[in-house]
Amino acid sequence: MHLGHEEFQRTDGRASTGPADAGPAGAGRAPRIGVGGPVGSGKTALVAALCRALSSSLRIGVVTNDIYTTEDADFLRRAGVLDPERIRAVETGCCPHTAIRDDITANLDMVEDLEADTGPLDLVLVESGGDNLTATFSYGLIDRQIFVVDVAGGDKVPRKGGPGVTGSDLLVINKTDLAPLVGADLDVMARDATAARGARPVVFTSLTADPTAADVTAWVRAQLAELSPRGGSYDASDASNASQPLNRM
């Protein structure tokens, strides 16, 4: 089932605050950032890092996606990165990209229920289940999207492209500490990522070396300064690196 961006119908009687409120100044809802990428690239670890870095100043909620389990949500709860009530899980029962792009009903309902149950939030992170390089989010569900790949797949990954690599708002190349172990050339990855994305930003990171994901956190703060429906109350003073096309960790 494919849903367009004009009409979304809930089945539980609650009013949808989705696409009609999408984009900057969406009335009555928090900005939403999607985090996608292949299995094992570090999506959940990045979500955890963002929660740790931002939760002292922002009210954050998280919705995870897995095909048959709640594994990623369970991990985040055990890690204590947020109040457990602010972490919700969608079991898609299908290919991950279907639930974030083709039929976003389950995710949209979960995000809306999260906000209705916990009160006003400043940011909702929606983590996709692990998928391939073609996975992208519908902008009826999110306002910005981060795509995470890692060096363990080899330095050819940015060159292979795909909508996630070329079209995401931020490309994160993760696990740079593993590059010497797998023979990945970070300079090649930087060159190919820049060629594929043009001016769209790319961040290299290692959550082992930098558990706060400082460059990604700065980029998120910069997006919130743009997207905030609450009058631009976010401090983007630490986001100076976010405008740079390439940051190496």
From Swiss-Prot:
Name of the molecule in the record: Urease accessory protein UreG
Which segments show compositional bias classed as Polar residues? 238-249
- Function noted in UniProt: Facilitates the functional incorporation of the urease nickel metallocenter. This process requires GTP hydrolysis, probably effectuated by UreG.
Q: Name one GO biological process term.
A: urea catabolic process
Please give the CDD domains that the UniProt record associates with this protein. UreG
Question: What broad taxonomic lineage does this protein's source fall under?
Answer: Bacteria, Bacillati, Actinomycetota, Actinomycetes, Frankiales
HAMAP family named in the record: UreG
Family affiliation: Belongs to the SIMIBI class G3E GTPase family. UreG subfamily.
How it assembles, according to the record, is: Homodimer. UreD, UreF and UreG form a complex that acts as a GTP-hydrolysis-dependent molecular chaperone, activating the urease apoprotein by helping to assemble the nickel containing metallocenter of UreC. The UreE protein probably delivers the nickel.
